[in-house]
């Protein structure tokens, strides 16, 4: 976030990210795969994919300038799918106790060994 409250791990591929995530979880550290994040990833926005809009002219999904309909598909942004599929995000509490930091550090070290 813009207040440095998240730490992101970018792994080499989705499979590696899943292994790393499982290892972190086993060490007591929760992460979220950004591609699976329902709110912050456009391809998970059901209202977006269904072209739901409050605009009576269906803008931005229709363009009154050329009468074309814009179509969006989950496969339209493969580079984003790749990058976000291998990105794990962990929340950081700015007042995190030293004990929690130690737990996170140990979990990261053990998870790195799995790779």
Segments the model singles out, each with a brief description of its role:
Residues 9-13, 92-94:
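Short beta-strand-to-loop capping motifs
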Residues 11, 15, 28-31:
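Alpha-helix capping/termination and helix-coil
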Residues 14-21, 96-103:
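Short, conserved charged micro-motifs
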Residues 1-10:
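Conserved glycine-rich beta-strand-loop-beta hairpin in the small C-terminal domain of fold type I
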Residues 21-87:
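Conserved PLP cofactor-binding pocket of PLP-dependent enzymes
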């Amino acid at each position: 976030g813009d207040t440095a409250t998240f730490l992101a791990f970018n792994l080499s591929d989705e499979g590696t990210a899943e292994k790393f995530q499982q290892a972190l979880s086993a060490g007591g550290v929760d992460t979220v795969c950004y591609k699976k994040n329902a709110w912050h990833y456009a391809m998970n926005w059901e209202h977006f994919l269904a072209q739901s809009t409050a605009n009576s002219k269906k803008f931005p999904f229709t363009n009154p300038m050329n009468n074309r309909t814009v179509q969006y598909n989950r496969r339209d942004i493969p580079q984003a799918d790749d990058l976000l599929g291998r990105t794990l995000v962990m929340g950081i509490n700015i007042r995190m106790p030293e004990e929690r930091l130690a737990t996170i550090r140990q979990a990261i070290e053990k998870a790195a060994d799995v790779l």
